[in-house]
Amino acid sequence: SGTPNGQHGNTHEAKLIKLDGDKPNESVSVRKGETVLLNGSRSDVYVDEGGVFGGNATVKSLSVAGVVAPGNSPGKITVLNDFYMNGTGVYKAEILDKDHYDQIVAQSVQLSNGGNSSKLELVYLPGGTIKKGDTFTIINNNGSAPVQGTFNGLPEGAEFAVDGATFKISYVGGDGNDVVLTAQNDSTGPKAPNTGGENVAVNLAGTIVGVASAAILLFMAKRKSFGKK
């Protein structure tokens, strides 16, 4: 399959655009610097380099030169026909556990163009738990044809690690033509980012020590002054 042809519709200029409802005959273009979250259905979706497309959506076709990030952490995008990624495209997939992770469902899947492979960016969500042997079908290819191409640096059977979790990737998983990650070890998701509480505690302790030291010095100075009288 190739890049879908046709007129681009609904060109947006805002930074964040939220689209809801079903408009199956309306296409969407996601421009550089834009994030479009679609919770509903549209026709053809085009994601330019520098654009981000997400939400729980059903679309006729999806062409990605930017970033596709299904769901609202996590979720699913269903593509009724072709899912196409070019060399600058990035699939940002989030995983919480074996029952909660991002997925793209499509009738045909192409992950590279002219030798330039798209990229997989896997995110292990805080609070997640993964057991060895857990499988994650991040692309469910409903068509009969195999996946065309592979993600950059991840050939068939490659292993890679994300936040302590190691995965093996296959492009012939599931019923024979799905992109499936298999966990190679038990792991837990990363801790939530530090909100500054630890730094506050350290700074507060330092302040207390500083105040105490100042008080001691002041007391000793007064004693010396008193002794001279």
Residue positions per predicted region:
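Extracellular beta-strand/loop-rich repeat segments of large surface/secreted proteins
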Residues: 14-28, 37-135
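Ser/Thr/Gly/Pro-rich low-complexity, disordered linker/stalk segments of secreted
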Residues: 1-11, 186-195
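C-terminal low-complexity, Ser/Thr- and acidic/Pro-rich disordered "stalk" regions positioned immediately N-terminal
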Residues: 164-200
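Active-site and glycan-interaction determinants of carbohydrate-active enzymes
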Residues: 145-165
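C-terminal membrane-anchoring or membrane-association module
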Residues: 212-229
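Surface-exposed beta-strand/loop patches in extracellular or lumenal glycoproteins
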Residues: 136-140
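Short, hydrophobic alpha-helical membrane anchors of single-pass surface/secreted proteins
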Residues: 199-210
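Domain-terminus/edge residues, biased toward the C-terminal soluble/receptor-binding domains
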Residues: 28, 141-142, 170
